[in-house]
């Protein structure tokens, strides 16, 4: 494995691996340790005290971050008729039906970041389950991406709506914004995300819900947050 660069090693010295920081301190450090030549993304990784193997302990949803993510999101919408026109007016990047299914299947085309569909188009979208599912792109009612209100869906996504869901190790991974953001913007995005995740706690979850929280920039070290201080 290649050694990390000099800048990374210098950044690492700023972080006390034995310490659990409060959110403001952690995000300040994430900004300081973002030393790459590009504008790194600051991410949150939240381990929950649930078991994703059980249906009644799933944690999944979406939340609009007040300051967005800093990323330009490309939206594909499956809709027809007046709903297709609505999606185009709202600013969707691609709108269609069977022809988009054929393009994805035939050309392995994935030049989009989010897929939205009206409920009546899910039969069409279902044919893409095997390719969209593993990429986390399958529309889902819980995340607001299966809906007839396409104007709201597209506007929220463009404004900074992010999805969160458990991976196999019961961790949620969500972008909080860019390292160039003001510290206050990243903190507000973080608190908005945490609030949504806490509210999504399954009734079947027992014991400590927020097990561990780490923030990091794309190329930077992980900075641990004290899960007992996050909502202070």
From Swiss-Prot:
Record GO biological process: regulation of translation; translation
A Pfam short name: Ribosomal_L1
InterPro entries recorded: Ribosom_uL1_bac-type, Ribosomal_uL1, Ribosomal_uL1-like, Ribosomal_uL1/biogenesis, Ribosomal_uL1_3-a/b-sand, Ribosomal_uL1_CS
This protein's UniProt keywords: Repressor, Ribonucleoprotein, Ribosomal protein, RNA-binding, rRNA-binding, Translation regulation, tRNA-binding
GO CC, any one term: large ribosomal subunit
Superkingdom of this protein's organism: Bacteria
A GO molecular function held by the record: structural constituent of ribosome
HAMAP family associated with the record: Ribosomal_uL1_B
Subunit (UniProt): Part of the 50S ribosomal subunit.
Role this protein plays: Binds directly to 23S rRNA. The L1 stalk is quite mobile in the ribosome, and is involved in E site tRNA release.
Stated family: Belongs to the universal ribosomal protein uL1 family.
Entry-linked NCBIfam families: rplA_bact (TIGR01169)
PANTHER family: 54S RIBOSOMAL PROTEIN L1, MITOCHONDRIAL, LARGE RIBOSOMAL SUBUNIT PROTEIN UL1M
Protein name per its UniProtKB record: Large ribosomal subunit protein uL1
Species in which this protein is naturally found: Alkaliphilus oremlandii (strain OhILAs)
